[in-house]
Curated annotation (Swiss-Prot):
Superkingdom of the organism of origin: Eukaryota
Entry comment describing in which tissues the protein is expressed: Primarily expressed in pancreas and brain.
Any one of the GO CC terms: cytosol
Name of the protein in its database record: Rho GDP-dissociation inhibitor 3
Similarity comment: family membership: Belongs to the Rho GDI family.
Record GO biological process: blastocyst hatching; negative regulation of cell adhesion; regulation of protein localization; Rho protein signal transduction
Role of this protein: Inhibits GDP/GTP exchange reaction of RhoB. Interacts specifically with the GDP- and GTP-bound forms of post-translationally processed Rhob and Rhog proteins, both of which show a growth-regulated expression in mammalian cells. Stimulates the release of the GDP-bound but not the GTP-bound RhoB protein. Also inhibits the GDP/GTP exchange of RhoB but shows less ability to inhibit the dissociation of prebound GTP.
GO MF term (any one): Rho GDP-dissociation inhibitor activity
Keyword Protease: no
Main location: cytoplasm
Alphabetic keyword roster: Cytoplasm, GTPase activation
Compartments in which it is found: Cytoplasm
Length: 225
């Protein structure tokens, strides 16, 4: 894509607001200067700990006398989210969909039921085709930052691939979010055909594991194999 759609722009603005508010909190709590350069969001730094999370209500009530910030928050955060079932997680992943113009139709993986059955199901991907992955999810109560979807692919017990999709930051909404990955090409050739086990994880910058599941993938010469 050459530009940003409304969802991507909103996610980036939401992340900027979160970082600005976290900076204020850190400055107020530490009674000193800004955080050290080493204290950055980097998974390669094992000692990194994310700043204390502020609830959506706390963010709305922060700096009530700052009119410009209050206006910015009203535009960005929108109305208060409707009440939801308290038993639901804050982030609810509903579906994973394989999209390909060369496929007979979308290949849909339902993630709202018994995830254990997915390990015994086989999702077919035709070799050499162009495809994208659509991730559908809901955010119910609090802002979530740095969502990412990871896929570890195994064959005969050995990991042969690791894919990470950076999904972004989102606020609570009654509407379901959809994130579509860039176009990729499926591998081809006799050496790559056959069954695989994929271990998937939906997580965020706080390393909260919102959902993890295993599923079967088979790269075949045709969609019906």
């Amino acid at each position: 894509m050459l530009g940003l759609d409304a969802c991507e722009l909103g996610a980036q603005l939401l992340e900027l607001l979160r970082l600005a508010l976290c900076a204020r909190v850190l400055l107020a709590d530490k009674e000193g200067g800004p955080p050290a350069v080493d204290e950055v969001l980097d998974e390669a730094v094992p000692e990194y700990r994310a700043p204390g999370r502020k609830s959506l209500l706390e963010i709305r009530q922060l700096d009530p006398d700052d009119r410009s910030l209050a206006k910015y928050k009203r535009v960005l955060l929108g109305p208060l989210p409707p009440a939801v079932d308290p038993s639901l997680p804050n982030v609810q992943v509903t579906r994973l969909t394989l999209l390909s113009e060369q496929a007979p139709g979308p290949v849909v993986m339902d993630l709202t039921g018994d995830l254990a059955v997915l390990k015994d199901q086989v999702f077919v991907l035709k070799e050499g085709v162009d495809y994208r992955v659509k991730i559908s999810f809901k955010v119910h109560r609090e802002i979530v930052s740095g969502l990412k979807c990871l896929h570890h692919t195994y064959r005969r017990g050995l990991r042969v691939d690791k894919t990470v999709y950076m999904v972004g930051s989102y606020g609570p909404s009654a509407q379901e979010y959809e994130f579509v990955t860039p176009v990729e090409e499926a591998p081809r050739g006799a050496l790559v055909r056959g069954p695989y086990l994929v271990v998937s994880l939906f997580t965020d910058d706080d390393r909260t594991h919102h959902l993890s599941w295993e599923w079967g993938l088979c790269i075949c010469q045709d969609w019906k194999d």
